[in-house]
Amino acid sequence: MGKSVVILGAQWGDEGKGKIVDLLTDRVKYVVRYQGGHNAGHTLIINGEKTVLRLIPSGILRENVTCLIGNGVVLSPAALMQEMGELESRGINVRERLLISEACPLILPYHVAMDHAREAALGKNKIGTTGRGIGPAYEDKVARRGLRVGDLFNREAFAEKLKTILDYYNFQLVNYYKAEAVDFQKTLDDVMAVADIITGMVADVTTMLDKARKNGDNILFEGAQGTMLDIDHGTYPFVTSSNTTAGGVATGAGFGPRNLDYVLGIIKAYCTRVGGGPFTTELFDEVGSEIARKGNEFGAVTGRPRRCGWFDAVAIRRAIQLNSISGFCMTKLDVLDGFDEVKICVAYKMPNGDILDYAPLAAKDWEGVEPIYETMPGWKENTFGVTDVNQLPEACRNYVKRIEEVTGVPVDILSTGPDRVETMILRDPFAA
């Protein structure tokens, strides 16, 4: 029997999902994106060569894997063409191995314009979006006015819908935000220039996945961003616009929830966050700066520096609840090499003195929260590239074990470097 495995971020994104997806795709026939858009950069390093994928599933680098983009993904034709071009210039066959749901909402230039206009208007109170039109595209989906991949099959009908929605957006852009209008004809021409390429990759993703499951094929679902950025369960309003949790697989790919066998939560050995929003364990001292430097904590897509802090078991417990996490993959363990001590946040102290074991839901409920830490001895030895768990320093192994104890979830995979070979698989998700 085949296995269906979800890989998702259990923190605030940037946990290293792309590498782990790539690592495990030698076991699968299908890799599926089910939410988000080209706002998430998945960085892969294979034999020293760096690849950043934003929209196309990471399995595209394995020639025997078919990649699917489910209906929960918002798709930018421009971003898709750019990414396909980058991959095809390296000899990677994309068009015959990438299939797209016709129900994917389209991201078009007016979404990007609105994203930028809103963030500029918010000033210091901005959400910290990537400015790629993700949120406005999801808004159109929920408002039932958005254009979808399936609309590309009919140019006349597409043009008519585009005119109506562009009038709606341009009125706001010009009159409220004092921004420039988006040109109708250029938008139409640019999209129609690539319409045949995109429609040529359209498939019934739900039926394909159902057949694959019944055929006993292994399927891997690739999440983007992280659990604490989920539109419903994250630190609202400092969240993304999609469901980043395991439930997104059912709604964003049309795959029944009872058919999932294993949920792999990706966690860093510490925590990072990009943009605004609560971050209880954030470090503002030299330790935080050193973690950022050693971990090269800058966004793969935006280049923005990431905020860094100690491991937060309280937030992780919420992620476990939301996702039914089967096991963890801990990445960037080597970044903690050399510190005299390492810390784990095991509880939150509220301003009224209450102790919380699970993270609050809304951002406002995090105000004044203080972390309660357990402090453990650090290790001076170099763990970069270690591939045998018994070669890790005892203090390092104790740190991993303690995280397992305070979360109640085993660490099944350990990563000690960016290359796919710099990994220890203690329990294979497809054999679990």
Swiss-Prot record:
Localization recorded for this chain is: Cytoplasm
CDD domains, per the entry: AdSS (cd03108)
Which residues are IMP-binding? 14-17, 39-42, 130, 144, 225, 240, 304
What is the first-listed, main subcellular location in coarse terms? cytoplasm
Q: Which cofactor does it need?
A: Mg(2+)
The note describing how and how many cofactors are bound reads: Binds 1 Mg(2+) ion per subunit.
Q: Which InterPro entries match?
A: Adenylosuccin_syn_GTP-bd (IPR018220), Adenylosuccin_syn_Lys_AS (IPR033128), Adenylosuccinate_synth_dom1 (IPR042109), Adenylosuccinate_synth_dom2 (IPR042110), Adenylosuccinate_synth_dom3 (IPR042111), Adenylosuccinate_synthetase (IPR001114), P-loop_NTPase (IPR027417)
Named in its record, the pathway it takes part in is: Purine metabolism; AMP biosynthesis via de novo pathway; AMP from IMP: step 1/2
- Which parts of the sequence bind Mg(2+)? 14, 41
Pfam families reported in the protein's UniProt record: Adenylsucc_synt (PF00709)
Source domain of life: Bacteria
Task: Provide the Gene Ontology terms for cellular component.
Answer: cytoplasm
Residues that coordinate or bind substrate: 300-306
Q: Does the keyword GTP-binding apply?
A: yes
Please give the function described in this protein's UniProt entry: Plays an important role in the de novo pathway of purine nucleotide biosynthesis. Catalyzes the first committed step in the biosynthesis of AMP from IMP.
Q: Which family does it belong to?
A: Belongs to the adenylosuccinate synthetase family.
Name used for this protein in its record: Adenylosuccinate synthetase
Q: What is the lineage of its organism?
A: Bacteria, Pseudomonadati, Pseudomonadota, Gammaproteobacteria, Pasteurellales
Gene that encodes it: purA
